[in-house]
Amino acid sequence: MAKSLETTVKIKKMKQLNPYVLVILSFIVVIFIGSFLLCLPFAQTSGKWGNYMDALFHAVSATCVTGLSTYVEGIGNQLTLFGQIVMMAMIQIGGLGFITVLTFFITLIKSKLEFKNRYLISQMVGSTNFADVVKFVRKLILISFIVEIIGTLIGLPVFLTAYPGQPSKAVWNSLFMAISAFNNAGFDLFGATSLVRGVGNAFIDSLPTWAYYYLCTYTMVLIVVGGISFLVIIDVFGFKKHRQWRAFTKIVLVTTAVLLVAGWGIFMLTDGLGGHGMNTFETLFQSVTLRTAGFSTYNQDNISLAGKIFGCFLMFIGGSPLSTAGGVKTTTIFMIFLAMFSYLRGKPVIAFKRTYSSNMIVKAMSLVFLGLFALIAGFIAISLFENKNLDGVVQTDTSTAIVYEVFSAFGTVGVSTGITPSITLGSKIVLCLLMFAGRLGPMTFFSIFQTNMDKKQGIHFEYVEEDFLIG
């Protein structure tokens, strides 16, 4: 009893600390260290100091696992092996979270963490049991390590075919691709045109047909696995007999499946059957990659207007909570649609034999509203910075290209119509802010103020409730 009371007192004291501030600061530290390293002469193939704004942009893009790049020739041609290692490290840290990685290495040295550290880390990684947070963090690291090693081994046949007699280069490219795909980063070492064929990408164009489709297929699998949430992976592959899946797992799997299949079908209508040139495989890849990955098998500038609009919808949704993906998350959209249909039918909000509170609905709607506000602000800012700077850069209408870029940045996707290398300094800063906000989530920033408000103790009272007309 005494121990339980002591634990309760400790938890109340820990709640005075703000884990969200630590999360934000940890990402900022990684970004600035990474940007400095990318600027170094031995990180650039030119052997000269790199442009700091470009280095900062790529540090943000990698740490926020986005994939947008201002390098005209791509990171594979712009960065040396050292620079590529720095990028890969930031992708890995950004996908898992700096606090998660740091906790793992600390526990290798110390067998136990202090109560304060366990509580804070549990809040940051989303663990519901702070007592077992170390075990949970180790599971996250182990899952990532296993998936990335398997992905590297699966990808080796492609790279050994592309680089005969160069096994070390093949292994490095396969490892980088596996880590980038699993963490939904969208970076590769092939050039500036991702996986698009017939546009002058020497690596992609040199691949036999089987190798190309093999590469794209296993990339899609890694993207999906990385975006469905570590909690779902643990739940599905926990190998515990007679244990039912959590409602969270069912919601994530159902929503993910619906979005993938519906996305495939809609892209077939807008860009497959519509005469825009996408084949069946490319429309499937488009449906997968726009959920925060950033790889592409088709020139995004050539996608129809309807395809771009639907693509923005997918980018806004993103992946699932506690995954390597960005966006407002699948569970958020699920909750909003569930609440809407429940309201129309005059029934309580129920799914998978569970009832959901109004607080969850309000939180989901707040997240969507904050996300849309960030997107609108980003679009206005970039439009002001660019003015007529982008005229003639892309075939697409400039405003459409900017909207696509803004959604891509906020959703930490990384696809682009091709305007990224041409944008001005101000626009680069705006995109960096959008990528940062998209990776951490608007609610992370909102929670800082919410936590500070909760700390203020005062006289509690309530106003009289009153309804007014809506709609």
Segments and roles (model prediction):
Residues M1-G471:
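Membrane-proximal intracellular helices of multi-pass ion channels
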